[in-house]
Amino acid sequence: MDYRSAGVDIDLGQAFVRGIRERVERIQVPSSGSSETLGGIGGFAGLFELPTGYQAPVLVAGTDGVGTKLDIAQQWGQHQGVGVDLVAMCANDVLTVGARPLFFLDYVATGKLEPEALWQVIDGILAGCQEAGCQLLGGETAEMPGFYPPGKYDLAGFCIGIVEKTAILDGSRVQLGDRLLALPSSGLHSNGYSLVRRIVADRGWRWDHRPPGWDRPLAEVFLTPTRIYVQAVQRLQAAGIAIHGMAHITGGGIPENLPRCLAPNQAARLQPHSWPIPQEFLWLQEQGQVETLEMFRTFNLGVGYVLVIPPEAENQVRSLLPEAFPIGEVVAACPGESRVLGLEQWGSLTSPAD
């Protein structure tokens, strides 16, 4: 008896790591100034030289996964997008405090190492790192026979960024009257998929079905990778825009995430129907008979990221980022009331309340 007969192929695992190292060496990740990786993939630990030019540098850490979106990818046989998702979920979180992503680590767990699928995942991770401007510094691939069913894997990611201590965005800069500008999502991103899968299954749909008016099957629409907002935010930072706060709209939607970038005594007042809800969300609401407030608490509804900026900066931001659109403003919070106001005025997602 040996380890391979128990389900763990050490030789295949080592070959997989060598392949990752070769891919990393071939791909030129955008330079992060004077910082660089020291050594390479495959050691006991990854080494990264911090960039110079900071007076009081603060490291920022974020970790996340992709959730049950992985189940759709595994059924459909398309895995690269979830690699991008993994980086996006972590890098976008790190970005919210004003940090610049520096490096990323991944954790892949599977019952049996299947290189064809996992290479797609790794290629997606590398593509995400390129877009976020960070380095893939290392990771872990765990083969766990008997723990995961055949063809199944799980992912976790870890992103480290850096920010000047005096530039940290922690809610203290936000002022009453600040504008809320949204950056559009690319779709569902990586949240709400347990409900998506339940709706699809209960209504008798298959992932290869195309609802009326759709130009792609359900699986392709719902596997659209999460958008990475690093370059958009860095464009504003380079222009000297005074960003007062940022929110990454993930699990819990706008109601749970937008208040996280505000001061405790502040609330966000949304302008009802200030943006068109993408068709996939309308379809989910109709198919699942989901109440509007529950839709807001589960999905991003087309808003992937929110910028909190002073009123005088709004025109410049919209000039630099034409895709940005206004959704509301910062107001004083009332004790005991919601910190996101205006949701009750939406009624349905397609028409104002009566």
From Swiss-Prot:
Enzyme Commission number(s) of this protein: 6.3.3.1
Catalysed reactions, semicolon-separated: 2-formamido-N(1)-(5-O-phospho-beta-D-ribosyl)acetamidine + ATP = 5-amino-1-(5-phospho-beta-D-ribosyl)imidazole + ADP + phosphate + H(+)
A molecular function GO annotation: phosphoribosylamine-glycine ligase activity
UniProtKB keywords: ATP-binding, Cytoplasm, Ligase, Nucleotide-binding, Purine biosynthesis
Pathway participation: Purine metabolism; IMP biosynthesis via de novo pathway; 5-amino-1-(5-phospho-D-ribosyl)imidazole from N(2)-formyl-N(1)-(5-phospho-D-ribosyl)glycinamide: step 2/2
Entry annotated with the keyword Cell wall biogenesis/degradation: no
Protein name as it appears in the record: Phosphoribosylformylglycinamidine cyclo-ligase
Species name: Synechococcus sp. (strain JA-2-3B'a(2-13))
Gene: purM
